[in-house]
A protein has these predicted regions:
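Topogenic membrane-insertion module of multi-pass membrane proteins
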Residues: 1-45, 224-227, 231-235, 239, ...
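Helical transmembrane-bundle signal
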Residues: 14, 18-24, 76-79, 123, ...
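Hydrophobic alpha-helical transmembrane segments of polytopic
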Residues: 10-13, 33-40, 119-126, 151, ...
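Multi-pass membrane catalytic core of lipid/isoprenoid biosynthesis enzymes
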Residues: 9-11, 53-132
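Short juxtamembrane and helix-loop transition motifs at transmembrane-helix boundaries
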Residues: 1-2, 26-32, 57, 104-115, ...
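Helix-coil boundary and interhelical linker segments in multi-pass alpha-helical membrane proteins
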Residues: 20-35, 78-118, 158-179, 226-229
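Interhelical loop and helix-boundary elements at the membrane-water interface
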Residues: 1-15, 52-70, 129-151, 196-211, ...
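C-terminal membrane-associated helical module and adjoining short loops/tails
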Residues: 140-252
Length: 252
């Protein structure tokens, strides 16, 4: 009983990180969002590790893990991109439903939305599909499609990258509808296509593939040092690029 509690407790901490991230995302405090998501991703790794070490793997824990991940790695990046759409200057529409509903419910129903910004929640839908597929497949050294935590890190780090001093002149090109829509749709595709990506766990069976994993880690360090926390977006791009090279290498 105690053994099962430890990994499940770590999973719930991941969920709490996701909930706090949502609150900060709505306040445009993207640095706090990224830190909390990083903590959630770490806890997501630790709960699985703890379950294996304690021999406490269970179907309950597996389902709880997915439910936590859909918040931290699905809902949070969707909200962050929704906020980016709003920051890009999209038109906000006001809806007044008082004339229709007020006589019945006596409520003040006036709200404002940016319709195009709702495209951001395709990320949440794509993440849900990805996590459902993940529950039916046992991954070892490789993934099929971009893992939801990696996808989440890309998007929650994006606001910080866009505001970085090195990219200030490119901000208008990064923070616009065309870029955000392209990134959103691309992420949904990348999460759900059968494209092989390596995990960062070193393999004792495929020594030649370890070089790509080591390269990912080593090259990530100067990127983070140069771009700060926003560099995590570039690290995910690096990860995808090295996977393309690795897959082409395997064909030779």
């Amino acid at each position: 009983m105690i053994k099962a509690f430890i990994p499940n407790f770590l999973t719930l901490l991941n969920l709490i990180c996701g909930c706090f991230s949502i609150a900060f995302a709505f306040q445009f405090q993207f640095d706090a969002v990224l830190i909390l998501v990083l903590m959630g991703v770490l806890l997501d790794f630790l709960d699985g590790l703890a379950a294996r070490l304690l021999n406490a793997e269970s179907n309950f824990g597996k389902q709880l893990d997915s439910l936590s991940d859909i918040v931290t790695s699905g809902v949070v990046p969707g909200i962050v991109v929704y906020q980016l759409f709003k920051l890009s200057g999209n038109r906000v529409l006001d809806f007044d439903l008082n004339s229709y509903m007020n006589p019945i419910f006596n409520l003040d129903l006036v709200f404002s939305i940016s319709p195009v910004a709702f495209i951001a929640f395709l990320i949440t839908l794509g993440s849900a599909v990805r996590l459902a597929k993940f529950n039916t497949i046992d991954y070892t050294d490789e993934f099929e499609g971009l893992p939801t935590p990696a996808n989440a890190l890309f998007f929650v780090a994006l606001p910080l990258l866009i505001d970085h001093v090195y990219l200030i002149e490119s901000k208008e090109y990064l923070l616009n509808n065309y870029t955000l829509i392209t990134l959103t749709i691309s992420s949904v595709i990348l999460m759900n296509v059968p494209f092989r990506l390596f995990s960062l766990r070193l393999s004792l069976r495929k020594y030649d593939y370890n070089i790509f994993k080591i390269l990912t880690i080593v090259l990530s360090i100067p990127i983070i040092l140069l771009f700060g926390l926003g560099g995590f977006s570039l690290v995910i791009i690096l990860y995808l690029f090295l996977n393309v090279i690795r897959n082409l290498w395997s064909l030779i």
